[in-house]
Amino acid sequence: VGQGYKLFPPPYTPPIGAPKDSITGSAQGGTDVQMPSQNNFSPSIHAGYFKHFPQSNWLWGARFSYNNLQATSTVNNQLIPQSGGYTQGGVYTAFNGNYLVRSYQQSIEQQFSLMPFLGHSFKSSYVYVGAGPTYSQIKTSLNSMTGFANFVGIPTAVTGLGNTSSYAVKQWVWGAAAMVGGTYFLDKDWSVDLNYTISKTSNHTTNWGGPWSFGGDAIDGPRTGTNEGTSSGSIVNQSVTLSLNFVF
């Protein structure tokens, strides 16, 4: 996760203290985030086709699937290190600090897949393996962000204490999946299928950010700025699916 901000407060005369010159500043930084795994139940629908090779127990086919996953992984109280500086009254001052993100979330909401497969049939069943592309909707969420800077060793909420920002971005990304499974025919019309699938989205980058403002307090005047950030990575999804299928 990478994050930066730009600061543009105007000149200000506080109720307490001397007048202050305007400030122009910026900071940036980044960090790695280790997301925990998430387990949940989700619905799935699929349609497929298979056919035997001539005079053989071997078969080929393809399966199109839709999975409404709605799986979210969350890291709370994530710190994004920052370094930068500001200019006030012609004097430049360097500083470092952190952006505090109360919760950072990566979600995979839904996924389409199309997987050709090869299999081998038995008396009333067949087993198969396959692989193919996926198209997934993912979501990146950063909730309740506050930017802190260390001025002379004292942490200061640059974006305003209690003045948080939140961002959420959805996008569709390509990926790939592989599956292995088996189908058992209950009769000529119905079958039961059990399969394991693992998929991985492509490495994607999400841009997020926007303006923020703080009304000021008795010491400091109003501040405005812009958050600018990116998040990059991929999502691995593993599923075990049990389905009842109609044969036609």
Regions found by a protein language model. Name each.
Residues W60-Q70:
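Acidic helix-start/capping segments at beta-turn-to-alpha-helix junctions
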Residues L118-S121, K170-W172, G182-F185, G233-S234:
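Exposed beta-sheet edge/beta-hairpin loop segments within beta-rich domains
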Residues H52-W60, K123-S124, L186-D189:
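Short loop/turn motifs that connect adjacent beta-strands in outer-membrane beta-barrel proteins
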Residues N39, H46-G48, W58:
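Mid-chain, structured segments of secreted extracytoplasmic proteins
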Residues D193-S199, N203-G209, N245-V247:
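A structural feature that tracks compact, well-ordered secondary-structure segments
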Residues Y5-N40, N68-Q110, S136-V173, T201-S239:
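Extracellular/periplasm-exposed beta-strand and loop segments of Gram-negative cell-envelope proteins
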Residues Q3, I45-K51, F64-Y66, Q110, ...:
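Residues on the lipid-exposed face of transmembrane beta-strands in outer-membrane beta-barrel proteins
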Residues P54-L59, V127-Y135, S144-N150, G175-A176, ...:
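Membrane-topology and secretion signals of cell-surface/extracellular proteins
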